[in-house]
Amino acid sequence: MGHEVDSVLPGLFRRTYGCGRPAISPVITGYSRIVNGEEAVPHSWSWQVSLQDQTGFHFCGGSLINENWVVTAAHCNVKNYHRVVLGEHDRSSNSEGVQVMTVGQVFKHPRYNGFTINNDILLVKLATPATLNMRVSPVCLAETDDVFEGGMKCVTSGWGLTRYNAADTPALLQQAALPLLTNEQCKKFWGNKISDLMICAGAAGASSCMGDSGGPLVCQKAGSWTLVGIVSWGSGTCTPTMPGVYARVTELRAWVDQTIAAN
Protein backbone atom coordinates (compact mmCIF):
# COMPACT_ATOMS: atom_id res chain seq x y z
CA MET A 1 0.00 0.00 0.00
CA GLY A 2 1.90 3.01 -1.25
CA HIS A 3 -0.20 5.40 0.79
CA GLU A 4 0.53 3.89 4.18
CA VAL A 5 3.54 5.30 5.91
CA ASP A 6 5.73 2.75 7.62
CA SER A 7 7.51 5.11 9.92
CA VAL A 8 11.22 4.81 10.52
CA LEU A 9 10.46 6.27 13.94
CA PRO A 10 8.76 3.37 15.72
CA GLY A 11 5.62 4.30 17.57
CA LEU A 12 5.34 7.75 16.04
CA PHE A 13 3.08 6.78 13.14
CA ARG A 14 2.50 3.01 13.25
CA ARG A 15 1.26 2.73 9.66
CA THR A 16 -0.92 5.77 9.33
CA TYR A 17 -3.52 6.21 6.65
CA GLY A 18 -2.80 9.66 5.30
CA CYS A 19 -5.64 11.97 4.36
CA GLY A 20 -7.06 12.11 0.87
CA ARG A 21 -5.31 8.99 -0.41
CA PRO A 22 -7.67 6.01 -0.33
CA ALA A 23 -6.04 2.57 -0.20
CA ILE A 24 -8.49 1.59 -2.97
CA SER A 25 -8.16 4.10 -5.81
CA PRO A 26 -11.28 5.76 -7.20
CA VAL A 27 -11.95 5.38 -10.93
CA ILE A 28 -13.79 8.27 -12.54
CA THR A 29 -14.90 7.69 -16.11
CA GLY A 30 -17.74 9.99 -16.90
CA TYR A 31 -16.58 13.13 -15.14
CA SER A 32 -21.15 12.66 -15.15
CA ARG A 33 -24.13 13.16 -12.66
CA ILE A 34 -25.19 11.33 -9.42
CA VAL A 35 -28.35 12.27 -11.19
CA ASN A 36 -26.61 10.65 -14.24
CA GLY A 37 -23.81 9.45 -11.99
CA GLU A 38 -22.03 6.13 -11.90
CA GLU A 39 -21.38 3.56 -9.23
CA ALA A 40 -18.19 4.24 -7.30
CA VAL A 41 -15.45 1.63 -6.96
CA PRO A 42 -16.40 0.03 -3.61
CA HIS A 43 -14.66 1.78 -0.69
CA SER A 44 -12.69 4.12 -2.94
CA TRP A 45 -14.20 7.20 -1.25
CA SER A 46 -12.98 5.95 2.10
CA TRP A 47 -14.12 9.04 4.04
CA GLN A 48 -17.73 8.78 2.85
CA VAL A 49 -20.13 8.50 5.77
CA SER A 50 -23.80 7.52 5.85
CA LEU A 51 -25.78 9.31 8.56
CA GLN A 52 -28.72 7.16 9.59
CA ASP A 53 -31.59 7.34 12.03
CA GLN A 54 -32.43 4.60 14.55
CA THR A 55 -34.24 2.57 11.87
CA GLY A 56 -31.23 2.56 9.55
CA PHE A 57 -32.78 5.14 7.21
CA HIS A 58 -30.00 7.07 5.41
CA PHE A 59 -30.80 10.78 5.59
CA CYS A 60 -27.50 12.54 4.87
CA GLY A 61 -23.92 11.99 3.85
CA GLY A 62 -20.80 13.21 5.60
CA SER A 63 -17.02 12.99 5.50
CA LEU A 64 -14.54 11.56 7.98
CA ILE A 65 -11.81 14.16 8.63
CA ASN A 66 -9.91 12.25 11.31
CA GLU A 67 -10.57 9.22 13.49
CA ASN A 68 -12.72 11.24 15.89
CA TRP A 69 -14.56 13.73 13.70
CA VAL A 70 -17.06 13.79 10.84
CA VAL A 71 -18.15 16.89 8.95
CA THR A 72 -21.59 17.27 7.37
CA ALA A 73 -24.16 19.99 6.66
CA ALA A 74 -25.87 21.94 9.45
CA HIS A 75 -29.23 21.45 7.71
CA CYS A 76 -28.87 17.68 8.23
CA ASN A 77 -29.69 18.44 11.86
CA VAL A 78 -27.77 15.52 13.36
CA LYS A 79 -28.94 14.40 16.80
CA ASN A 80 -27.18 12.39 19.49
CA TYR A 81 -29.37 9.36 18.78
CA HIS A 82 -28.37 9.20 15.10
CA ARG A 83 -25.77 6.75 13.79
CA VAL A 84 -22.62 7.34 11.76
CA VAL A 85 -21.83 4.46 9.41
CA LEU A 86 -18.29 4.15 7.99
CA GLY A 87 -16.92 1.79 5.36
CA GLU A 88 -20.25 1.30 3.61
CA HIS A 89 -20.71 0.81 -0.13
CA ASP A 90 -23.81 -1.33 -0.62
CA ARG A 91 -26.51 -0.19 1.79
CA SER A 92 -28.54 -3.34 1.02
CA SER A 93 -25.75 -5.68 2.18
CA ASN A 94 -25.08 -6.80 5.73
CA SER A 95 -21.73 -8.40 4.92
CA GLU A 96 -19.49 -5.38 4.52
CA GLY A 97 -17.92 -5.07 7.93
CA VAL A 98 -19.08 -1.49 8.34
CA GLN A 99 -18.35 0.52 11.46
CA VAL A 100 -21.53 1.79 13.08
CA MET A 101 -20.49 4.65 15.32
CA THR A 102 -22.35 6.46 18.06
CA VAL A 103 -22.57 10.24 18.05
CA GLY A 104 -20.65 11.72 20.98
CA GLN A 105 -21.23 15.45 20.47
CA VAL A 106 -22.75 17.63 17.76
CA PHE A 107 -21.46 21.11 16.91
CA LYS A 108 -23.60 23.14 14.52
CA HIS A 109 -22.02 26.32 13.17
CA PRO A 110 -23.27 29.08 15.50
CA ARG A 111 -23.96 31.35 12.52
CA TYR A 112 -25.82 28.77 10.44
CA ASN A 113 -28.83 30.48 8.89
CA GLY A 114 -31.58 28.21 7.59
CA PHE A 115 -33.03 31.03 5.47
CA THR A 116 -29.88 32.09 3.60
CA ILE A 117 -28.27 28.65 4.12
CA ASN A 118 -25.02 30.39 5.06
CA ASN A 119 -22.50 28.49 7.23
CA ASP A 120 -24.15 25.16 6.40
CA ILE A 121 -21.66 23.04 8.34
CA LEU A 122 -21.85 20.77 11.36
CA LEU A 123 -19.23 18.67 13.12
CA VAL A 124 -19.90 15.33 14.78
CA LYS A 125 -17.47 14.08 17.39
CA LEU A 126 -17.68 10.30 17.47
CA ALA A 127 -18.24 8.70 20.88
CA THR A 128 -15.31 6.36 20.17
CA PRO A 129 -12.59 6.72 17.52
CA ALA A 130 -13.06 5.09 14.14
CA THR A 131 -10.67 2.33 13.12
CA LEU A 132 -8.75 3.47 10.05
CA ASN A 133 -8.19 0.69 7.54
CA MET A 134 -8.28 -0.12 3.82
CA ARG A 135 -11.90 1.00 3.61
CA VAL A 136 -12.00 3.84 6.14
CA SER A 137 -9.60 6.78 6.02
CA PRO A 138 -9.98 10.56 6.24
CA VAL A 139 -10.27 13.21 3.56
CA CYS A 140 -7.93 16.21 3.60
CA LEU A 141 -9.55 19.55 4.45
CA ALA A 142 -9.07 22.54 2.19
CA GLU A 143 -6.88 25.21 3.81
CA THR A 144 -8.16 28.73 4.35
CA ASP A 145 -5.88 30.13 1.65
CA ASP A 146 -6.39 27.38 -0.96
CA VAL A 147 -7.75 28.47 -4.34
CA PHE A 148 -9.83 26.05 -6.40
CA GLU A 149 -10.40 27.63 -9.81
CA GLY A 150 -13.61 27.65 -11.82
CA GLY A 151 -13.53 24.85 -14.41
CA MET A 152 -11.59 22.47 -12.17
CA LYS A 153 -13.02 18.93 -12.27
CA CYS A 154 -14.05 17.65 -8.86
CA VAL A 155 -16.16 14.75 -7.61
CA THR A 156 -19.19 14.43 -5.37
CA SER A 157 -20.40 11.13 -3.93
CA GLY A 158 -23.41 9.84 -2.07
CA TRP A 159 -26.45 7.61 -1.93
CA GLY A 160 -28.80 10.41 -2.94
CA LEU A 161 -31.68 10.03 -5.36
CA THR A 162 -30.56 9.28 -8.92
CA ARG A 163 -33.74 10.92 -10.26
CA TYR A 164 -35.61 13.57 -8.32
CA ASN A 165 -38.82 11.52 -8.50
CA ALA A 166 -37.21 8.16 -7.71
CA ALA A 167 -39.00 6.14 -5.04
CA ASP A 168 -35.88 5.23 -3.12
CA THR A 169 -32.21 6.07 -2.83
CA PRO A 170 -29.70 3.75 -4.52
CA ALA A 171 -28.12 0.90 -2.57
CA LEU A 172 -24.68 1.41 -4.11
CA LEU A 173 -22.55 4.49 -3.52
CA GLN A 174 -22.73 6.81 -6.54
CA GLN A 175 -20.23 9.39 -7.76
CA ALA A 176 -20.33 12.23 -10.25
CA ALA A 177 -17.54 14.37 -11.63
CA LEU A 178 -18.49 18.03 -11.81
CA PRO A 179 -16.72 21.22 -12.85
CA LEU A 180 -16.40 23.98 -10.26
CA LEU A 181 -17.98 27.31 -11.13
CA THR A 182 -16.78 30.72 -10.09
CA ASN A 183 -19.31 32.44 -7.84
CA GLU A 184 -19.78 34.98 -10.63
CA GLN A 185 -20.83 32.17 -12.99
CA CYS A 186 -23.00 30.61 -10.31
CA LYS A 187 -24.90 33.84 -9.73
CA LYS A 188 -26.07 33.64 -13.36
CA PHE A 189 -28.16 30.67 -12.22
CA TRP A 190 -28.94 31.47 -8.60
CA GLY A 191 -28.54 35.25 -8.33
CA ASN A 192 -27.95 36.81 -4.94
CA LYS A 193 -28.67 33.56 -3.09
CA ILE A 194 -24.96 32.79 -3.63
CA SER A 195 -22.67 34.10 -0.89
CA ASP A 196 -18.92 33.90 -0.36
CA LEU A 197 -19.60 31.03 2.07
CA MET A 198 -20.76 28.89 -0.87
CA ILE A 199 -19.11 27.25 -3.88
CA CYS A 200 -20.95 25.83 -6.88
CA ALA A 201 -20.32 22.83 -9.11
CA GLY A 202 -22.14 21.14 -11.94
CA ALA A 203 -24.49 22.58 -14.57
CA ALA A 204 -22.81 20.33 -17.13
CA GLY A 205 -25.26 17.44 -17.17
CA ALA A 206 -24.66 16.32 -13.59
CA SER A 207 -25.93 17.30 -10.17
CA SER A 208 -26.04 16.24 -6.53
CA CYS A 209 -29.53 15.37 -5.39
CA MET A 210 -31.55 14.95 -2.22
CA GLY A 211 -30.00 12.49 0.21
CA ASP A 212 -26.50 13.54 -0.75
CA SER A 213 -26.82 16.51 1.61
CA GLY A 214 -23.83 16.87 3.90
CA GLY A 215 -21.68 14.70 1.67
CA PRO A 216 -18.36 15.59 0.06
CA LEU A 217 -17.28 17.61 -2.94
CA VAL A 218 -13.60 16.71 -3.32
CA CYS A 219 -10.91 18.06 -5.62
CA GLN A 220 -7.37 16.83 -6.09
CA LYS A 221 -4.64 18.99 -4.58
CA ALA A 222 -1.05 17.78 -4.87
CA GLY A 223 -2.30 14.24 -5.43
CA SER A 224 -4.56 14.15 -2.36
CA TRP A 225 -8.34 14.34 -2.44
CA THR A 226 -9.33 17.48 -0.56
CA LEU A 227 -12.74 18.45 0.82
CA VAL A 228 -13.67 21.68 -0.97
CA GLY A 229 -17.44 21.64 -0.52
CA ILE A 230 -20.19 20.11 1.61
CA VAL A 231 -23.39 19.33 -0.30
CA SER A 232 -25.77 22.09 0.78
CA TRP A 233 -28.61 22.95 -1.61
CA GLY A 234 -29.68 23.14 -5.24
CA SER A 235 -32.69 22.71 -7.45
CA GLY A 236 -35.65 20.89 -5.92
CA THR A 237 -35.86 18.76 -9.05
CA CYS A 238 -32.09 18.08 -9.16
CA THR A 239 -31.93 19.63 -12.62
CA PRO A 240 -28.59 18.67 -14.17
CA THR A 241 -28.43 22.01 -15.97
CA MET A 242 -28.45 23.90 -12.67
CA PRO A 243 -25.33 23.93 -10.50
CA GLY A 244 -25.43 22.42 -7.04
CA VAL A 245 -24.42 24.65 -4.16
CA TYR A 246 -21.96 23.57 -1.50
CA ALA A 247 -20.69 25.06 1.76
CA ARG A 248 -17.24 26.48 0.94
CA VAL A 249 -14.74 24.71 3.18
CA THR A 250 -11.94 27.27 2.75
CA GLU A 251 -14.21 29.86 4.41
CA LEU A 252 -15.24 27.48 7.20
CA ARG A 253 -11.88 25.84 7.92
CA ALA A 254 -11.00 28.20 10.77
CA TRP A 255 -14.22 27.32 12.61
CA VAL A 256 -13.53 23.60 12.09
CA ASP A 257 -10.01 23.94 13.52
CA GLN A 258 -11.21 25.99 16.50
CA THR A 259 -14.02 23.55 17.29
CA ILE A 260 -11.80 20.48 17.12
CA ALA A 261 -9.05 22.15 19.16
CA ALA A 262 -11.52 23.09 21.91
CA ASN A 263 -13.22 19.69 22.14
UniProtKB/Swiss-Prot annotation:
Keyword Disulfide bond: yes
DNA damage as UniProt keyword: no
Top EC class for this record: hydrolase
Main location: secreted
Keywords: Digestion, Disulfide bond, Hydrolase, Protease, Secreted, Serine protease, Signal, Zymogen
Domain Peptidase S1: residue ranges: 34-261
Annotated GO MF terms: serine-type endopeptidase activity
Subcellular locations according to the entry: Secreted, Extracellular space
Signal peptide: 1-18
Catalysed reactions listed for this entry: Preferential cleavage: Tyr-|-Xaa, Trp-|-Xaa, Phe-|-Xaa, Leu-|-Xaa
Annotated EC: 3.4.21.1
Cellular compartments per GO CC: extracellular region
GO BP annotations, alphabetical order: digestion; proteolysis
Catalytic machinery residues: H75 (charge relay system), D120 (charge relay system), S213 (charge relay system)
Pfam families on file: Trypsin
Protein family: Belongs to the peptidase S1 family.
Protein name: Chymotrypsin A
Species per Swiss-Prot/TrEMBL record: Gadus morhua (Atlantic cod)
